[in-house]
């Protein structure tokens, strides 16, 4: 027996007109957002802070965390992430031309390209023969970024100083189910900003002592060196890192960067 169906109260055309009105509203709001970004660009140009990079990873992370939290069950976290990353990437490109430098070997990975595309949208990718060449280029162009695979051959180039003042400003993926460690590191000159949920990436020659105050969030080997992501926005000159450096000089600890922790969502 068929279940009786009640005739729809409204026509499909009426419902679709409502979708069209909502889309018009979204479009107007996007245009308004881009106009406000132009004022941010002018402000940064006026204070000289565009000279380094228009990208503010801390602010970007706070926007995403707030909206994903506010969306709750009404809008999937992944949709929020994709929409606002597309908006933020375009907003950044409106402020300055940005390129992402990487080695040919790194860009040959479709998975790496996909992670970069979903985070940086249409930002241009510039291919180099090696990680060292990509890091050297970002050192010379502070508004640009460099991307490397966590398990790629970048650490020696970094230790040899090829990245200049560039630091790790973020890791990808930025959203997802808890994973043991990220896949990509992003280098740049954006000023690190504390967001309340941050990590500090350190490179050491050997394991951190077992009794060290902080439990690493993840660790990875890179060549003979040890990479550890520590919870918090830490400074080399303050506790607990300063004590670690003093009592364990042979670790040759260097801070690679400080950045907002990725967003963990249940799969
Ligand atoms: C608009 C800004 O510039 C960039 C774009 C952002 C955005 O689209 O919201 C946020 C931070 C910056 O990476 C800003 O600094 O506020």
Model feature map: region roles:
Residues 1-267:
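Domain-level signature for soluble enzymes in the chorismate/prephenate branch of the shikimate pathway
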